[in-house]
Amino acid sequence: MTSGYPDYVLGNEAFDAELYANPFRQWTTQELLDQISSRPLLYDPGTNWNYAHTNYLLLGLALEKAAGQDMPTLLQRKVLSPLGLTATANSDT
């Protein structure tokens, strides 16, 4: 991905410490965004590439805004139900 956003998981020692202290914690979207809010971009957007969970979080927020539904509802309505996936669960974190 070429956004330049840092990953809130990879290379984030504070996140790692909290994750290992409570591996079953359910993180809120805001808590995940807070993990990167004070960190600078890794590079100018479009000039390089890196994997970042952050990009998927932001994509989910954009989809929720555009659809007017939360992500679990949107996934159920647009993906899981049409495919007949009845034993698939959503993980927010």
Regions found by a protein language model. Give the residues of each.
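Active-site-proximal loop and beta-strand segments within enzyme catalytic domains
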Residues: 1-52
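Active-site helix/loop module of the DD-peptidase/beta-lactamase fold
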Residues: 1-13, 38-40, 61, 65-93
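Well-ordered alpha-helical segments within folded domains of soluble proteins
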Residues: 55-60
